[in-house]
Amino acid sequence: MRYPWFRLAIFVVGCLFPAWWLYEAAMSLLGPDPGKIMMDRLGLGALTFLLVTLCMTPLQKLTGWSGWIVVRRQLGLWVFAYIVLHILAYLFFILGLDWGQLAVELRKRPYIIVGALGFLGLLVLAITSNRYSQRRLGARWKKLHRLVYAVLGLGLLHFLWIVRSDLREWSIYALIGAVLMVLRIPAVARGLPRVARARGRAV
C-alpha cells in the first residue's frame, strides 16, 4: 500500500468529526435540537470532503506528488459515508421514521429532492469506484466519473435552497467549487504543470 500514513491520517480525520459530534450530543452541547445540528454538520462535512476530493488532481499537477491521486478514491468514499449518515440523521431525528410524513416533506421542502438526486449520483460513483469497474467500463469510466461535478452542483443547490438569505457560508463553498471547475477547463489544466515547473525554477 502506497502512502500508508497519509491514508491513515485521512481515515482518522474522517472518523474524528462524527465521533466528536456524537460526544457533543451526549454531553448536551449541541443545543435544544442536536439531531438537526448533527444532520447539518454531516451534510456540510460531505460537501467539504467533496471539494477536498476535487482538489486532488490540481494539487498533483501543481506539485507532481502522486500521493494526492492515491487518496482521491478514499476521500470520495468518505463523501459517500458522510452523505449516508446525513440521510440517516434526517430519517431518524427529523422524520422520526414516519414514512407517511415523507410525501409531505417533499412537497414542503423540494430541496430534499435535489439532495436525493445528488445522493443517487454519489451512489453510482461509489459503486463504480474500483478497479473492476474501471476495467469493465474502459474509457467510459472517466466519462461516468465526471458526474461528480453534477453532484457538486446539486449539493450546492441543495445547500443554497436551505440557507436562502444568509449566503456568506454558502458563497465560500460555491467560490471554491467554481475555482475547481475552472481548473477542469483543458487549457487551464494543461497549464498547471507549467506553473509548477516555473515555480521550481524560481526556487
Swiss-Prot record:
Q: Kindly indicate whether the keyword Repeat belongs to this entry.
A: no
* InterPro entries reported in the protein's UniProt record: Fe3_Rdtase_TM_dom, MsrQ-like
Task: Give one Pfam family.
Answer: Ferric_reduct
Its main subcellular localisation, reduced to a broad class, is membrane
| One Gene Ontology term from the biological process aspect of the record | protein repair
Its assembly, as annotated, is:
Heterodimer of a catalytic subunit (MsrP) and a heme-binding subunit (MsrQ).
Task: Cite the PANTHER family for this sequence.
Answer: PROTEIN-METHIONINE-SULFOXIDE REDUCTASE HEME-BINDING SUBUNIT MSRQ
**The protein's name in its UniProt record:** Protein-methionine-sulfoxide reductase heme-binding subunit MsrQ
- What would be the name of the gene that encodes this protein? msrQ
